[in-house]
Amino acid sequence: MSSLYKPFCVSEGPCKDAILRRGCAPLQHPAAPTRIPSPGGGSTRTFTPIPNIYPGQRTLAAAAIGGRKITHPWKAIFAGGIAGGIEICITFPTEYVKTQLQLDERANPPRYRGIGDCVKLTVQYHGLRGLYRGLSSLLYGSIPKSAVRFGTFEVLSNPMRDATGRLDNKASLLCGLGAGIAEAVLVVCPMETVKVKFIHDQCSLRPRYRGFFHGVREIIRDQGVRGTYQGLTATLLKQGSNQAIRFYVMNLLRNWYKGDDPARDMHPLVTAMFGATAGAASVFGNTPLDVVKTRMQGLEAHRYKSTMDCAFQILKNEGPLAFYKGTVPRLGRVCLDVAIVFVLYEEVVKLLNNVWRTD
């Protein structure tokens, strides 16, 4: 079979622990020592061959990880894409409100008095569908973003797991950082730039963009491909720290819950609770970066010379509390987002393991 489907080679050794691994090879006893005469007719020397304790070595696509198999990268990509698509359809209204409040700068007379007022005015003037304006741009980005995130995390984490499949907490932090950087460069920065510009445009008196693809064409025509990578530095910092915190907290809680029994199953409700906790931790950890990123990707991005200049102007003109604008709606959205994504991801992987064999 192609090496693409068998990227990891694992040796199956003897079952020394109380927890038996499938396909374990029996322990072989060492061979008897052999006496070899020394050159020149002197005394003999004793040679003991080194036994092959692990004869059952073969290539595997998966090894036991806490009661489940190592997730094949292609399964992770597929499951991550499905989870990301479903999640964004559920949580987009909170993302819309968060973006609106962040774009509602204090320098101008504020349009909204708070979350409730933002929702009320949006529904009043645009109906319930108004809360889903800009969904297409985020949906097109959420599916590949989640796919890249989980695929990259599995590629990086699988070789770092121990014999029982447990991933060290520090390793999960590094793997999460790598996953966040990958999704930022490949998906998040261009798609988030388009999303913010699209939502901002729809709130103007005379919207220019008739749809997602028309908006992309207009942005590229006016600003080039570089126009879709505005705020790359802020996005790298935000996504890298985001996923590092989330995967670290999630892995920390998972290891604590399973304790000395890596085969212990996690109920979806437990996964959801751990995911919500990881999401909350990431919100308080990097909301300032999210605010700067949103400003750098908005239609007024030309006002800022760089990411640092944007942060300095926000601090100078609006004060430190401006870095936490939209925290409450973002907290609710992210907790729900991360909980849903982790639950859906785990369940889809279980389903794929039943219908898609990679060993």
Curated annotation (Swiss-Prot):
Which residue intervals correspond to the Solcar repeats?
A: 71-159, 170-256, 266-351
State the annotated membrane topology for this chain: Multi-pass membrane protein
List localization entries.
Answer: Mitochondrion inner membrane
* One example of a Gene Ontology biological process annotation: neuromuscular junction development
Please list every transmembrane segment annotated in the UniProt record, as residue ranges: 77-97, 171-191, 269-289, 336-356
Gene3D superfamilies given in the database record:
Mitochondrial carrier domain
Q: Which InterPro entries match?
A: Mitochondrial_sb/sol_carrier (IPR018108), Mt_carrier_dom_sf (IPR023395), TXTP-like (IPR049563)
Which keywords does this Swiss-Prot/TrEMBL entry list?
Answer: Antiport, Membrane, Mitochondrion, Mitochondrion inner membrane, Repeat, Transmembrane, Transmembrane helix, Transport
Q: Which GO terms describe its molecular function?
A: antiporter activity; citrate secondary active transmembrane transporter activity; tricarboxylic acid transmembrane transporter activity
Phenotype upon gene inactivation: Morpholino-injected embryos display altered tail morphology, impaired swimming and defective touch-evoked escape responses. Neuromuscular junction development is abnormal and motor axon terminals show short and erratic outgrowth toward the muscle fiber with no evidence of complete synapse formation. In addition, knockdown embryos often show edema of the hindbrain, heart, yolk sac and tail.
Catalytically driven reaction(s): (S)-malate(in) + citrate(out) = (S)-malate(out) + citrate(in); D-threo-isocitrate(in) + citrate(out) = D-threo-isocitrate(out) + citrate(in); citrate(out) + succinate(in) = citrate(in) + succinate(out); cis-aconitate(in) + citrate(out) = cis-aconitate(out) + citrate(in)
GO cellular-component term (any): mitochondrial inner membrane
Keyword Chloroplast attached: no
Q: Which domain of life is it from?
A: Eukaryota
Q: How is it modified after translation?
A: Possesses a short cleavable presequence, which, however, is found to be dispensable both for targeting to mitochondria and insertion into the inner membrane. However, the presequence is required to keep SLC25A1 in a soluble state and thus in an import-competent state. Mature SLC25A1 lacking the presequence is prone to aggregation.
Please explain the role this protein plays, according to its UniProt record: Mitochondrial electroneutral antiporter that exports citrate from the mitochondria into the cytosol in exchange for malate. Also able to mediate the exchange of citrate for isocitrate, phosphoenolpyruvate, cis-aconitate and to a lesser extent trans-aconitate, maleate and succinate. In the cytoplasm, citrate plays important roles in fatty acid and sterol synthesis, regulation of glycolysis, protein acetylation, and other physiopathological processes.
Q: Which family does it belong to?
A: Belongs to the mitochondrial carrier (TC 2.A.29) family.
- Protein name per its UniProtKB record: Tricarboxylate transport protein A, mitochondrial
What is the taxonomic lineage of the source species?
A: Eukaryota, Metazoa, Chordata, Craniata, Vertebrata
Q: Which gene encodes it?
A: slc25a1a
